[in-house]
Amino acid sequence: MLMRQKGIIIKAVDYGESDKIITILNEHGAKVPLMARRAKKVKTGLQAQTQLFVYGLFIYNQWRGMGTLNSVDVISQHYKLQMDLFVSSYASLAAETIERSMDEGDIAPYNYQLLQFVLEKIESGTSAQLMSVVVMLKCMKRFGFTASFNRCAVSGNDTQADLIGYSFKFDGAISRQEASKDVHAVILSNKTLYLLDVLQKLPIDKMNSLNIHQEIIDEMSDIILMLYREYAGMFFKSQKLINQLKRLEQ
């Protein structure tokens, strides 16, 4: 059966000498794996069209199991996401988080909206690292956990100015008054905890101007990755490249 669906490539894996297996997140919020034959050959024209983040109309044959890609009518190549390694790696982290949050057969229209929103924001100049934080905050429940940043997990104190870190012992933010009860709590700036709470709760269609200091973004990114590792046992492939790039900067 010939299928035509708009979608965004969220995963691309080389298969053999000349083929690729791509996964698109289609406009209905479903993951669709496709075999792209000879996609690594320049003459086929599919090499550029099967890159990560390509948004287009995908035409493919689908019978049982994996479909076979025929062609792609590209709507947006998202070139800006490919031009900078840091931007590309954090955009990949966002895409990988969404892809791994979904089981085969899941339908999640919100994930498609979230991915479109994030890629458009990055293209317009918003920090890709910040956008990866937004995605990971929004996808937490799909990985089976949540995190609270707006009240002390020990005392219930919700005075934001008193919160000084995150406690894995008590599974939540911790206040300075209770800090002695967990000497291993991850110390975070008050602003980091506040913004994590805001971004977690704020609908994406209300996120207009996102101008946050880099030190705060770094803190948010680090604690979010720790949460995923501790609560969901997740280590993302994109994170390996990010860690390598950070080491090169030092």
From Swiss-Prot:
Biological processes annotated in GO: DNA recombination; double-strand break repair
The UniProt record lists the keyword DNA damage: yes
SUPFAM superfamilies: ArfGap/RecO-like zinc finger (SSF57863), Nucleic acid-binding proteins (SSF50249)
Assigned keywords, A-Z: DNA damage, DNA recombination, DNA repair
Recorded coiled-coil stretches: none
Pfam families linked to this entry: RecO_C, RecO_N
Top-level taxon of origin: Bacteria
PANTHER family in alphabetical order: DNA REPAIR PROTEIN RECO
Protein purpose: Involved in DNA repair and RecF pathway recombination.
Descriptive protein name: DNA repair protein RecO
The organism's taxonomic lineage, starting at the top: Bacteria, Bacillati, Bacillota, Bacilli, Bacillales
Gene name of this polypeptide: recO
